[in-house]
Curated annotation (Swiss-Prot):
Family as reported in the entry's similarity comment: Belongs to the protease inhibitor I11 (ecotin) family.
UniProt protein name: Ecotin-like protein 2
GO BP terms in the entry: symbiont-mediated suppression of host complement activation
SUPFAM superfamilies: Ecotin, trypsin inhibitor (SSF49772)
Length: 158
């Protein structure tokens, strides 16, 4: 394997031969392939945070959040999970922006989520998003008792 390449690089959803549903005309399907870490570490030391959202034109002063829901479903007869995201309205704080901060620019506005999902390199994480949505995710790692770190990544559409 070339240096810098992950074990997950180059995988496709078809490699898993599971009947994941096709996205509807109003959806995009994102697929996340995770690198193997070892069964015990995956179970105890790693978690995945899904960060759905949408790029919106917003000012640089206020804090914005997207409303919505993440629903977990399973493939009948297989037990493989997949997720359907619904995005609703955006809300923000009401501070008065001044100067350059008042300029509206395209920025990713994340849905407020609190769930962490099991890290399992044997199965892809399949997420169906609205067409105008975007999915990012974080891999959380335990460093020691009571502390951890996270690395954010943009998910791949398939």
């Amino acid at each position: 394997m070339p240096a810098g390449m992950s074990d997950a690089a180059g995988k496709t959803l078809a490699d898993f031969k599971a009947p994941y549903p096709e996205p509807t005309s109003q959806q995009r399907r994102y697929v996340i392939f995770l690198d193997p870490k070892g069964d015990s570490k995956e179970l105890n030391d790693y978690k995945v945070e899904l960060i759905p959202g949408r790029v919106e034109k917003v000012d640089g002063t206020n804090v914005y959040r997207m409303g919505g829901n993440i629903e977990e479903r399973t493939i009948d007869g297989w037990g493989y999970p997949y997720y359907i995201v619904t995005l609703t309205t955006m809300s923000g704080t009401l501070m008065m922006p001044l100067g350059d901060a008042a300029l509206k620019r395209p920025r990713f506005v994340a849905m407020n989520t609190k769930n962490l999902y099991r890290y399992n390199s044997r199965l892809p994480i399949v997420v169906y998003m609205p067409k105008d949505g975007e999915l990012r995710y974080r891999i959380w790692t335990v460093k020691s008792t009571g502390s951890g770190t996270a690395k954010s990544t943009k998910a791949r559409e398939m």
